């Protein structure tokens, strides 16, 4: 992903304020609610029958935190996203058989959640930078599929 120095600054500046536990769970929860077919990858998570059940599910929150911690690793390695996510790409492709389109969906949901949490601070410039990053991460996660 090619980001300008200003875009990198915008991304890292906002990311330093992100509560990974809260935002991760909310992003994954919203993915599972807005795109319910993604729930099939989370059969072991228990009750996902209603939006309230999804958003209060401890396993959704825990996995969302794990996802965002991996995303944080990506932010530290923007010049080598494919390398950073190589093992996760392999896992999601070969073992879990996740449709790579879901990575794009989750990235877009994450952008929505960040906008919700940061309001006016999430300017169009910040959004544009984050859209580049989530697209790059989704592409890196889909790399094993190519």
UniProtKB/Swiss-Prot annotation:
<dbReference type="GO" id="GO:0005344">
    <property type="term" value="F:oxygen carrier activity"/>
</dbReference>
<dbReference type="Pfam" id="PF00042">
    <property type="entry name" value="Globin"/>
</dbReference>
<dbReference type="GO" id="GO:0031838">
    <property type="term" value="C:haptoglobin-hemoglobin complex"/>
</dbReference>
<dbReference type="GO" id="GO:0072562">
    <property type="term" value="C:blood microparticle"/>
</dbReference>
<protein>
    <recommendedName>
        <fullName>Hemoglobin subunit beta</fullName>
    </recommendedName>
</protein>
<dbReference type="GO" id="GO:0046872">
    <property type="term" value="F:metal ion binding"/>
</dbReference>
<keyword id="KW-0597">Phosphoprotein</keyword>
<dbReference type="GO" id="GO:0019825">
    <property type="term" value="F:oxygen binding"/>
</dbReference>
<dbReference type="InterPro" id="IPR000971">
    <property type="entry name" value="Globin"/>
</dbReference>
<feature type="modified residue" description="N-acetylvaline">
    <location>
        <position position="1"/>
    </location>
</feature>
<feature type="modified residue" description="N6-acetyllysine">
    <location>
        <position position="144"/>
    </location>
</feature>
<dbReference type="InterPro" id="IPR050056">
    <property type="entry name" value="Hemoglobin_oxygen_transport"/>
</dbReference>
<keyword id="KW-0007">Acetylation</keyword>
<keyword id="KW-0408">Iron</keyword>
<feature type="domain" description="Globin">
    <location>
        <begin position="2"/>
        <end position="146"/>
    </location>
</feature>
<feature type="modified residue" description="N6-acetyllysine">
    <location>
        <position position="82"/>
    </location>
</feature>
<dbReference type="GO" id="GO:0020037">
    <property type="term" value="F:heme binding"/>
</dbReference>
<feature type="binding site" description="proximal binding residue">
    <location>
        <position position="92"/>
    </location>
    <ligand>
        <name>heme b</name>
    </ligand>
</feature>
<keyword id="KW-0813">Transport</keyword>
<keyword id="KW-0702">S-nitrosylation</keyword>
<dbReference type="InterPro" id="IPR012292">
    <property type="entry name" value="Globin/Proto"/>
</dbReference>
<feature type="modified residue" description="Phosphoserine">
    <location>
        <position position="44"/>
    </location>
</feature>
<dbReference type="GO" id="GO:0004601">
    <property type="term" value="F:peroxidase activity"/>
</dbReference>
<keyword id="KW-0561">Oxygen transport</keyword>
<dbReference type="GO" id="GO:0005833">
    <property type="term" value="C:hemoglobin complex"/>
</dbReference>
<dbReference type="GO" id="GO:0031721">
    <property type="term" value="F:hemoglobin alpha binding"/>
</dbReference>
<keyword id="KW-0479">Metal-binding</keyword>
<comment type="subunit">
    <text>Heterotetramer of two alpha chains and two beta chains.</text>
</comment>
<dbReference type="GO" id="GO:0031720">
    <property type="term" value="F:haptoglobin binding"/>
</dbReference>
<comment type="function">
    <text>Involved in oxygen transport from the lung to the various peripheral tissues.</text>
</comment>
<feature type="modified residue" description="S-nitrosocysteine">
    <location>
        <position position="93"/>
    </location>
</feature>
<feature type="binding site" description="distal binding residue">
    <location>
        <position position="63"/>
    </location>
    <ligand>
        <name>heme b</name>
    </ligand>
</feature>
<dbReference type="GO" id="GO:0042744">
    <property type="term" value="P:hydrogen peroxide catabolic process"/>
</dbReference>
<dbReference type="GO" id="GO:0043177">
    <property type="term" value="F:organic acid binding"/>
</dbReference>
<dbReference type="InterPro" id="IPR002337">
    <property type="entry name" value="Hemoglobin_b"/>
</dbReference>
<comment type="similarity">
    <text>Belongs to the globin family.</text>
</comment>
<dbReference type="InterPro" id="IPR009050">
    <property type="entry name" value="Globin-like_sf"/>
</dbReference>
<keyword id="KW-0349">Heme</keyword>
<feature type="modified residue" description="N6-acetyllysine">
    <location>
        <position position="59"/>
    </location>
</feature>
């Amino acid at each position: 992903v090619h980001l300008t120095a200003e875009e990198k600054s915008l991304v890292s500046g906002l990311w330093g304020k992100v509560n990974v536990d809260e935002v991760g769970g909310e992003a994954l929860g919203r993915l599972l609610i807005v795109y319910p077919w993604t729930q099939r990858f989370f059969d072991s998570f228990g009750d996902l029958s209603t939006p309230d059940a999804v958003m209060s599910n401890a396993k959704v929150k825990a996995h969302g935190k794990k996802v965002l911690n991996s995303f944080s690793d990506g932010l530290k390695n923007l010049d080598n996203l494919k390398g950073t996510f190589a093992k996760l790409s392999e896992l999601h492709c070969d073992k879990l058989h996740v449709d790579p389109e879901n990575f794009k969906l989750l990235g877009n949901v994450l952008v929505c959640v960040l906008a919700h949490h940061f309001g006016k601070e999430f300017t169009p410039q910040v959004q544009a930078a984050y859209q580049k990053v989530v697209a790059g991460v989704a592409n890196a996660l889909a790399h094993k599929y190519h």
